[in-house]
Amino acid sequence: MALPSRILLWKLVLLQSSAVLLHSGSSVPAAAGSSVVSESAVSWEAGARAVLRCQSPRMVWTQDRLHDRQRVLHWDLRGPGGGPARRLLDLYSAGEQRVYEARDRGRLELSASAFDDGNFSLLIRAVEETDAGLYTCNLHHHYCHLYESLAVRLEVTDGPPATPAYWDGEKEVLAVARGAPALLTCVNRGHVWTDRHVEEAQQVVHWDRQPPGVPHDRADRLLDLYASGERRAYGPLFLRDRVAVGADAFERGDFSLRIEPLEVADEGTYSCHLHHHYCGLHERRVFHLTVAEPHAEPPPRGSPGNGSSHSGAPGPDPTLARGHNVINVIVPESRAHFFQQLGYVLATLLLFILLLVTVLLAARRRRGGYEYSDQKSGKSKGKDVNLAEFAVAAGDQMLYRSEDIQLDYKNNILKERAELAHSPLPAKYIDLDKGFRKENCK
């Protein structure tokens, strides 16, 4: 008889669970994290130490020392007459189960795979009169600092109830006959309750900075912090050496940014981003930082000046406005920019070489043309000789020699020589027939 009764009991449990799930509106997993945005305006004097507060206890990771006991389920009962609730049992994600009262051992049961499938329902094998009251299913996540609760009211009747389960507008109400089994449904299949990940690898904190006039989507990254201990620093060099976050930030949940000493150029909007992907935490805090000029300290009253006991140094001119400090930041060029400039230089050099070769070829061709024209003119002069030109030249010479040059000579000898020189040469007579006659005589 034990086996059929056990089969009948589990059939009843499955029937009640399928009926109750239709009325359980709280079985939908709640949001594990909320997006919180806080915005504040802060101001410090230049040279002071600025601290931008960014704290969150939900980002503390040291509670992972609990290993797999950071997720726990509690079932509590508050009687019909009110009064404080009493703890019935606990179930840890490692599988450890604890029942507080001896009378409930073996009578109250939970599924051993509750933290795997998200079914945290409580089974009461045989309902008694003292079991009536308000039951609460409490889920705690110590690591993510999450708390979720679900309430179910149990009514015990003498006979079979007319309505086994219904919804009263706030919670589920379950009516069960005395001695019958009861299943108090509590289902939450959120990944934060059913999955286990490496939490340290899913926590990261970012600090961003927006200079004045720069939109949020073009903000500069200052710091990256990881729960594993890795840190990355970005941003301009003049600011990188003056900002810091505590080394024990993830141990205390304090990610406040310290800037020391503060300069006028540090003005802008700073954002602290907290991300915990495992716990579903995404927070962003915004700080509008303004930097004021430091107040000038008054000179001591006893300082000498212009022979008097009071300071005679002229005070600052109120009409002159103090300018802001200008810091030139030289950003190193990338390798791609270097190759681009090198390409420009090589292209310019190649163009210059081509231009030089073109000029040389043109000059050489022009020089060859001149030589060819000179050779051609020389040949033409050697072939065509005009004897008339020579005759004219000889006549000119004779006319030149026949000119009467009036010279004053010291003696007659010189005068005669000069006349002989200017007189035309006597024509030479050549007897052509003489040679012919000699040949005939032979």
From Swiss-Prot:
Phosphoserine PTM positions: S228
Side of membrane Extracellular, spans: 20-341
Q: Which domain of life is it from?
A: Eukaryota
Name the residues that span the membrane: 342-362
UniProtKB keywords: Cell adhesion, Cell junction, Cell membrane, Cell projection, Cytoplasm, Disulfide bond, Glycoprotein, Host-virus interaction, Immunoglobulin domain, Membrane, Nucleus, Phosphoprotein, Repeat, Signal, Tight junction, Transmembrane, Transmembrane helix
Enumerate the Pfam families for this protein.
V-set
Instruction: Please state, per the UniProt record, what induces or represses the expression of this protein.
Output: Up-regulated in vein endothelial cells (HUVECs) in response to VEGF signaling.
Can you name this protein? Answer: Matrix remodeling-associated protein 8
Q: Which gene encodes it?
A: MXRA8
